[in-house]
Structure formats: C-alpha cells, structure tokens
C-alpha cells in the first residue's frame, strides 16, 4: 500500500487507462506494418507485455521482446556497483519491423539512447518508436516519446513506478522529501 506521505500520480485504474490510450495510439499509427513491442528491463518489459496484450485485444498482432541495456549505458564506469546483467529476449528478427521501445519513465533520454544502440545490435528495424508510461521532462539528449501515459510537470522529482507483476501493485508515486 502506498504511504499517505507520497503523492500518487497514477493508481491501478489510472495505469490501465494510460496503457489503453497508448495501445490505441500504437494501433492507429502505421497500420499493417509488422509490429514488435520491446520493453527495457526491468519495468519496461512488464509494461511492454501489457501493451502487447492490449494491442492484441484491438485486433493487431504484435511480437513481444525485452532488452537489457546495462552494458550500453554511458555511465557504466561511474557506477559504484557493477550492473546486474539480465538476458535480453528478442526471439525474432527486428529487420524491417516496426519496433516500439517501451520504458517506464523517460527523463534525460540517456537510457533510450543506450536502448537504441542495443537494439541495432539485433538488426535493422524499419522504424523505431518510443512509448513510456511517465514522461518527466528534463531531457539531456534529443529524444521524445511517441506514446506517453502521463506527463509530469515535476522537473527533477524522483518517480517510483510499481507494477503488479513485479511489485504486487500498480502505482506511480512521487515520494515525499
């Protein structure tokens, strides 16, 4: 349960509505192209799996994949601890596919830059789009989402995304200081 001292940005039903809107946007744009929805480990993959399910409910087939970007980060040598490596799961070729990369929170854009580098190691997609549940603003690189669940105007605020599959509940909160 979310402590009352935290600002609730989205609750479970709010996350569900946001993902529904994102799925409708994905389906409406570029219909007929082969589609893969690829989540960034560790929360983007959960969101991506839900988006695949919602897109399928709308009558569009989409392949699911997940990608670990740990070794592609530009701050890997500045980290105090070694990143924990997880296996990417892309059981299909991304060549000539429309790939929607999915992350939980978009902030500086550096994570997505790393994800693009990782994705190109798997092939040459026809088109890459970006979906994020939360857009925090604060870009340091020129990356913008194509599909967004919620835009925050709390520049620099820490955001915690919890997903039922990994954390037992769906919520997006801003912790109090």
Swiss-Prot record:
Keyword flag Repeat: no
Motif PRPP-binding boundaries: 99-111
Gene3D superfamilies in UniProt: 3.40.50.2020
Keyword annotations of the record: Glycosyltransferase, Transcription, Transcription regulation, Transferase
Catalytic activity line of the entry: UMP + diphosphate = 5-phospho-alpha-D-ribose 1-diphosphate + uracil
InterPro entries tied to this protein: PRibTrfase_dom (IPR000836), PRTase-like (IPR029057), PyrR (IPR023050), PyrR_bifunctional (IPR050137)
Keyword Transcription: yes
One of the record's GO molecular function terms: uracil phosphoribosyltransferase activity
EC number: 2.4.2.9
Summary of the function given for this chain in its UniProt record: Regulates the transcription of the pyrimidine nucleotide (pyr) operon in response to exogenous pyrimidines.
Protein name: Bifunctional protein PyrR
Organism: Akkermansia muciniphila (strain ATCC BAA-835 / DSM 22959 / JCM 33894 / BCRC 81048 / CCUG 64013 / CIP 107961 / Muc)
């Amino acid at each position: 349960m979310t402590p009352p001292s935290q600002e609730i940005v989205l609750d479970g039903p709010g996350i569900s509505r946001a993902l529904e809107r994102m799925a409708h946007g994905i389906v409406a744009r570029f219909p007929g192209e082969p589609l893969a929805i690829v989540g960034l480990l560790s929360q983007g993959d959960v969101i991506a799996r839900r988006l695949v399910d919602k897109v399928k409910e709308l009558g569009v087939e989409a392949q699911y994949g997940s990608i670990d970007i740990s070794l592609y980060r530009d701050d890997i040598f500045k980290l105090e601890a070694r990143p924990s490596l997880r296996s990417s799961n892309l059981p299909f070729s991304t060549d000539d596919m429309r790939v929607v990369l999915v992350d939980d929170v978009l902030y500086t854009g550096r994570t997505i830059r790393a994800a693009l580098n990782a994705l190109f190691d798997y092939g040459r997609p026809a088109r890459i789009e970006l979906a994020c549940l939360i857009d925090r603003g604060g870009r340091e690189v020129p990356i913008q989402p194509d599909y967004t669940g919620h835009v925050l105007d709390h520049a620099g605020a820490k955001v915690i995304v919890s997903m039922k599959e990994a954390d037992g509940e769906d919520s997006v909160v801003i912790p109090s200081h």
